Amino acid sequence: MIVPIRCWTCGRPLGHLWEPFRNRVLAGEDPGKVLDDLHVTRYCCRRTLLAHVELINQVLPYGLIEK
């Protein structure tokens, strides 16, 4: 839902790489090539960025609780 700040497995900081990765992939570049250019070489880190799905906009309306 929210972009992971660190890799779940090794703990490497990844939050700063999400926007460049997403923008380049949406522009039509190959995700593997983008990760190589961003120097993301570990399988665990690549998996964290590749498998992330942004659902925050769909979940936000359900988080409001009125009293």
From Swiss-Prot:
Annotated Zn(2+) binding sites: 7, 10, 44-45
What is written in the cofactor note of this entry? Answer: Binds 1 zinc ion.
**Which keywords are on file for this protein?**
Cytoplasm, DNA-directed RNA polymerase, Metal-binding, Nucleotidyltransferase, Transcription, Transferase, Zinc
Q: Which reaction does it catalyse?
A: RNA(n) + a ribonucleoside 5'-triphosphate = RNA(n+1) + diphosphate
Gene3D superfamilies named among the record's database cross-references: Homeodomain-like
The biological process GO terms on file are:
DNA-templated transcription
What is the first-listed, main subcellular location in coarse terms?
Answer: cytoplasm
Q: What is this protein called?
A: DNA-directed RNA polymerase subunit Rpo10
The annotated subunit structure for this chain is: Part of the RNA polymerase complex.
Recite the lineage of the species: Archaea, Thermoproteota, Thermoprotei, Thermoproteales, Thermoproteaceae
Q: Which GO terms describe its molecular function?
A: DNA binding; DNA-directed RNA polymerase activity; zinc ion binding
Q: What does this protein do?
A: DNA-dependent RNA polymerase (RNAP) catalyzes the transcription of DNA into RNA using the four ribonucleoside triphosphates as substrates.
Which family is annotated? Belongs to the archaeal Rpo10/eukaryotic RPB10 RNA polymerase subunit family.
Q: Which cofactor does it need?
A: Zn(2+)
EC number assigned by the record: 2.7.7.6
HAMAP family named among the record's database cross-references: RNApol_arch_Rpo10
Q: One cellular component GO annotation, for this chain's record? A: DNA-directed RNA polymerase complex
| NCBIfam families xrefs | PRK04016.1
Classification via InterPro entries: RNA_pol_su_RPB10, RPABC5/Rpb10
Q: Where in the cell is it found?
A: Cytoplasm
